[in-house]
Amino acid sequence: MSSSARGITLLCLLLIVSSTVLHFSIGGGSNGEKRRDDGDGDGDDEKVRLLLGANALGERDRRHGHGHGGGVSSAPAPAPAPARAHLPPPLLHKNARLPDPVPGRVGLGHRRGNATAAHRRRSEREGKKSTPLVVVAAGAALSGAAAVLLVVLVVFLACRRFQRRAMPGADQSGTNKVSFDPGPDVFYLDAVKPYVEADHGGGGGVVKTAPELAGPKEEPRCEEEDSGVALSDDGADSVHSSCCFHSSHFSYSELRDTKPGSNGVSPSPSGRSRRRSSAPVTPSEKNKAASPYSPQCPRTPSNRERSSRAHSPSSSVSDLTSVSTSVVKDHEVRRAVHSLMFPEAQSGGAGHVKEDEAESGNMRPPPPPPPPPPPPPPAVTQQQDVKTSCGPAVPPPPPPTPPPPPPLLAPKQQSSGGPILPPAPAPPPLFRPWAPAVGKNGAPLPKLKPLHWDKVRAAPNRRMVWDRIRSSSFELDEKMIESLFGYNARCSTKHEEVQSRSPSLGHHVLDTKRLQNFTILMKAVSATAEQIFAALLHGNGLSAQQLEALIKMAPAKDEADKLSAYDGDVDGLVPAERLLKVVLTIPCAFARVEAMLYRETFADEVGHIRKSFEMLEEACRELMSSKLFLKLLEAVLKTGNRMNVGTARGGAMAFKLDALLKLADVKGTDGKTTLLHFVVQEMTRSRAAEAADIAAGLGAELTNVRKTATVDLDVLTTSVSGLSHGLSRIKELVGSDLSGDERNQCFVAFMAPFVAHAGEVIRELEDGERRVLAHVREITEYYHGDVGKDEASPLRIFVIVRDFLGMLERVCKEVRGAKNCHGGNPALNLNNV
């Protein structure tokens, strides 16, 4: 229970007790006053009745005496009255009604005296009755004030809790409580402090005193211990939780310096764990077990809370933060404190793990601990004070390295207090663990590009081909393989490529996007500004690829004006702008680039055009001289006239070659034999030749026809006209634009012979173009008759013949297969093919 809850409970109990006491005191006082008033009233009434009774008796005697005298007589002389003896008052019933006294007599004086006394008693009674009312009013006011104070306190606590939740470190508020009960570790540190100071002379780290090292959290630690006891009951305890709890008395810096021999277990076992390992613990004792450092512990957390705490990295970090009270930064001091406090951790650090494992018995293996967060950056100062809940939040250090999991099943004799058997040795690994490879000289080998494969386990009882491989039979060329498949070279190359792709732009004149394009093209040129300047002056020295990139770098008119008007430092410009500014200083610079590119590509263009012209001429000659193609046309003509008998299409003397592509669309009654199949069968029967011979013969006779079908005559004619137009611009550049300046004489002298030679070649190409067009028109008229303007393409006839030859080869193959299978009439057996 928190301190605020205790305060509220105590205040409520105090109010209840005070109200009860006040109530009983008021009630008792009022009852006593009432009883006293009743007693006084009864006594007064009795006295009045007695007095009234005595007077009545005297009057009655006097009346009786006067009557016995027998008449009216003068009153006797007064005589001294004898002394009346004090008679006891008559015994009358308290409810007896006495006669009224005679008015004007002694009774009146007596009533007057009684009235004064009654008035005094009534005023006293009213004063006594008003006293409890005042006390009740005071108690009510006190209760109201206490209630208002309680409401104010509750509202203040609620606001404070809301503020804590809203703070960034609110999630750690539950773990930042500080207990005033110091643990045993404080006395340990105080005991070893003189030895540490004597060994190190007070230098290095600073050991904190007991008030600073007091256990910061008693309640979370009790919860951890109780959770550990509960886990041992249901078989869900683990070495990780035990080790994390025992190591909570030390800082993370000490945990980080634990030697490997301790297997990651903290050397600070609790007294409870030692007693558990020495004697068996009954379930009743487990339920009564508590931490020796905290005598009063809260409730034991449930299994769900323990599982969430065990599997949550944030909870483990917060628990470690809450119990870590100081950080000793000096390495030597930490090791000295560690060795003096827990000498058994150096030799048998793993013994506590074995004891916990022996106690766990036949417990189920716990789930693996979550991976620890990355370690924090190194601290700058040598001493860090642990902040409580009143101070600012401190970033929690990461948890220690989790210990290895316990064995799956422990022997039963260990749970009954028997000797602890050593664990069985681990099985040999399937593959050797990875280790950094080293070369012959001991230097580590560079990492290469991996080859992904599946390893094969060696079978000891089976002979394999891999057993015959000798390790010394093959040696690698390390330099070659590193140069080809090394990561460093490739990464450096990629880094250079990335830098080249995204260059840093300095001072520039042109637009940024346009300048980036110029920079990319400049990389394709791969030449300096001086080399390009010299090549443009002389007319040679650059390849076709470089000239094409330079042509693409030609700036617009406004861009050229900006670069020409720039009169600043040329070296301050980016490389692309500097190159353009140097090039623009040459007269007709980009016209020269076009002329040089024309000269470089002229020979290739002319060769392609001449080859196409020659192929067209050969194709025309093949179509006019092919005899087998003529026989095929004859067979198709006769078959078509037979099928068109009685129609307007019958009796034809010729047909356009487009009809050859329709022969495969006319199918027979069997649904598979086409008209082309019939024509091929008739040709093989009449000529006593194989169908394959027909297809092969036509393919050999019409070889160039198939090639010509891929030629576009319009492209050829456009190429010839383009060459002629380019030569005209070069003549204009050399003859007029560059003829007046002496600096241009080198370029003019170099281009003049080429201009003369190119003129002659272009004239030959123009003559060849006219000749080829004449042949194409002639072959088209040879097959189709008069060709009008409706002819879409002069070379369409070559495309038709190429497609028909492909269909013919397929049909001839089918006919030959049907004939080989059945040996009879292939037309009758074509359905079985």
UniProtKB/Swiss-Prot annotation:
<dbReference type="InterPro" id="IPR015425">
    <property type="entry name" value="FH2_Formin"/>
</dbReference>
<dbReference type="GO" id="GO:0030036">
    <property type="term" value="P:actin cytoskeleton organization"/>
</dbReference>
<keyword id="KW-0732">Signal</keyword>
<keyword id="KW-0812">Transmembrane</keyword>
<dbReference type="GO" id="GO:0005856">
    <property type="term" value="C:cytoskeleton"/>
</dbReference>
<feature type="compositionally biased region" description="Low complexity">
    <location>
        <begin position="260"/>
        <end position="271"/>
    </location>
</feature>
<dbReference type="GO" id="GO:0016020">
    <property type="term" value="C:membrane"/>
</dbReference>
<feature type="transmembrane region" description="Helical">
    <location>
        <begin position="136"/>
        <end position="156"/>
    </location>
</feature>
<feature type="compositionally biased region" description="Pro residues">
    <location>
        <begin position="393"/>
        <end position="409"/>
    </location>
</feature>
<feature type="compositionally biased region" description="Pro residues">
    <location>
        <begin position="420"/>
        <end position="431"/>
    </location>
</feature>
<feature type="compositionally biased region" description="Pro residues">
    <location>
        <begin position="364"/>
        <end position="379"/>
    </location>
</feature>
<feature type="compositionally biased region" description="Low complexity">
    <location>
        <begin position="310"/>
        <end position="326"/>
    </location>
</feature>
<feature type="domain" description="FH2">
    <location>
        <begin position="438"/>
        <end position="833"/>
    </location>
</feature>
<feature type="compositionally biased region" description="Basic residues">
    <location>
        <begin position="108"/>
        <end position="122"/>
    </location>
</feature>
<comment type="similarity">
    <text>Belongs to the formin-like family. Class-I subfamily.</text>
</comment>
<feature type="signal peptide">
    <location>
        <begin position="1"/>
        <end position="19"/>
    </location>
</feature>
<dbReference type="GO" id="GO:0045010">
    <property type="term" value="P:actin nucleation"/>
</dbReference>
<dbReference type="InterPro" id="IPR042201">
    <property type="entry name" value="FH2_Formin_sf"/>
</dbReference>
<feature type="compositionally biased region" description="Pro residues">
    <location>
        <begin position="77"/>
        <end position="91"/>
    </location>
</feature>
<feature type="region of interest" description="Disordered">
    <location>
        <begin position="340"/>
        <end position="435"/>
    </location>
</feature>
<keyword id="KW-0472">Membrane</keyword>
<feature type="region of interest" description="Disordered">
    <location>
        <begin position="254"/>
        <end position="326"/>
    </location>
</feature>
<dbReference type="GO" id="GO:0051015">
    <property type="term" value="F:actin filament binding"/>
</dbReference>
<dbReference type="InterPro" id="IPR027643">
    <property type="entry name" value="Formin-like_plant"/>
</dbReference>
<feature type="region of interest" description="Disordered">
    <location>
        <begin position="199"/>
        <end position="234"/>
    </location>
</feature>
<protein>
    <recommendedName>
        <fullName>Formin-like protein 2</fullName>
    </recommendedName>
</protein>
<dbReference type="Pfam" id="PF02181">
    <property type="entry name" value="FH2"/>
</dbReference>
<keyword id="KW-1133">Transmembrane helix</keyword>
<feature type="region of interest" description="Disordered">
    <location>
        <begin position="26"/>
        <end position="130"/>
    </location>
</feature>
